[in-house]
């Protein structure tokens, strides 16, 4: 999406100096800090946390 403020309209990748375009661990073109909750626990589930190096929300490795 060339109209996105984080996206370089030519490459469709994050603009220079920006980390990401979208995702649960991306806000204002930057990765969220490590340890930021990106998916809250439900039932017996545990919270999932941002890594600080990706816009994805990784699954908690301690889940069964």
Swiss-Prot record:
Keywords: Cell adhesion impairing toxin, Disulfide bond, Hemostasis impairing toxin, Platelet aggregation inhibiting toxin, Secreted, Toxin. GO terms for cellular component: extracellular region. InterPro entries: Disintegrin_CS (IPR018358), Disintegrin_dom (IPR001762), Disintegrin_dom_sf (IPR036436). It is found in: Secreted. GO terms for molecular function: toxin activity. SMART domains: DISIN. A motif (Cell attachment site) lies at residues 42-44. Pfam families: Disintegrin (PF00200). Residues 1-64 form the Disintegrin domain. Expressed by the venom gland. Disulfide bonds join 6-29, 20-26, 25-50, 38-57. The keyword Signal does not apply. SUPFAM superfamilies: Blood coagulation inhibitor (disintegrin) (SSF57552). It comes from the Eukaryota. Inhibits ADP-induced human platelet aggregation. Antagonist of alpha-IIb/beta-3 (ITGA2B/ITGB3). Heterodimer with subunit alpha; disulfide-linked. Belongs to the disintegrin family. Dimeric disintegrin subfamily. PANTHER family: ADAM A DISINTEGRIN AND METALLOPROTEASE DOMAIN (PTHR11905), ADAM METALLOPROTEASE (PTHR11905:SF159). This is Disintegrin CV-11-beta. It comes from Cerastes vipera (Sahara sand viper). The lineage of its organism: Eukaryota, Metazoa, Chordata, Craniata, Vertebrata.
């Amino acid at each position: 999406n060339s109209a996105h403020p984080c996206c370089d309209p030519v490459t469709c990748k994050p603009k220079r100096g920006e980390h990401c375009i979208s995702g649960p661990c991306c806000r204002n073109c930057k990765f969220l800090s490590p340890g930021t909750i990106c998916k809250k626990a439900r039932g017996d589930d545990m919270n999932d946390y941002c890594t600080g190096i990706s816009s994805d929300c990784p699954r908690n490795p301690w889940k069964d």
